[in-house]
Amino acid sequence: GNAFVVSLALADLVVALYPYPLVLLAIFHNGWTLGEMHCKVSGFVMGLSVIGSIFNITAIAINRYCYICHSFAYDKVYSCWNTMLYVSLIWVLTVIATVPNFFVGSLKYDPRIYSCTFVQTASSYYTIAVVVIHFIVPITVVSFCYLRIWVLVLQVRRRVKSETKPRLKPSDFRNFLTMFVVFVIFAFCWAPLNFIGLAVAINPSEMAPKVPEWLFIISYFMAYFNSCLNAIIYGLLNQNFRNEYKRILMSLWMPRLFFQDTSKGGTDGQKSKPSPALNNNDQMKTDTL
């Protein structure tokens, strides 16, 4: 399961390394100055990040659903080899979903948001396909998975104490809650832009002029800001991530002390802190009351 979280983090990180700095440069120069190639590449990378994020969030929801609701089959379905295969498939599908931008000419500079991005009016059919693939289908799948998990959680809480009846471990519930919040924040940040895109695609000539510029700008920057939120959510809801964040900050503030502690930990034996995992597949998935 952690492989999907790392993959999601990669999708969030890639926009911070390339497209976002170019957006800042465009704001500074009040226009795009880097040429068409950088424009198309940055728009393509942005698309990879966006679609890769929702595909990974969907994969995490399915993973949590199998882990909690079908625990007996989990280890077989999500073996190490299968998990790597699933992650690879996610990124292959992400590339397949993003490449058509080059053929429909939908990657252009938009001065309202100072970035090269997907133009919703370039192709109505492709815009509808993007909204369906990027938003509607994933939201439906993730909603089903988390609804089933919530039903199980409620059923477990209502059970009478018994040595034979399983219950969820608190750590499993916290991990599920963390990823559920990630999903809710994603849906909240991306819903306005997708609904605008769908409305414009259905009737471009009538709907495009009716969309207020302020609403379009706010919806775009809400979507952009989503990539920055996941790390904050992990830190707020997961103790292991908070510990690792503290270690990173300590290493930046007092690197000498940090490396001394690291060296000391290595000589004291196998006492290193656990990685900031969101789940632990080596533990039993059920427990008794």
Curated annotation (Swiss-Prot):
Q: According to its UniProt record, in which tissues is this protein expressed? A: Brain and kidney, with trace levels in lungs.
**Could you tell me where this protein is found in the cell?**
Cell membrane
Q: Topological domain, Cytoplasmic: which ranges?
A: 1-2, 63-81, 148-179, 235-289
Q: Which Gene3D superfamilies does the UniProt entry name for this protein? A: Rhodopsin 7-helix transmembrane proteins (1.20.1070.10)
For region Disordered, the annotated ranges are 264-289
**Got any disulfides in this one, which pairs?**
C39-C116
**What PANTHER family does the record tag this protein with?**
B2 BRADYKININ RECEPTOR/ANGIOTENSIN II RECEPTOR (PTHR24228), MELATONIN RECEPTOR TYPE 1B (PTHR24228:SF54)
What family is reported? Belongs to the G-protein coupled receptor 1 family.
- Protein's recorded name: Melatonin receptor type 1B
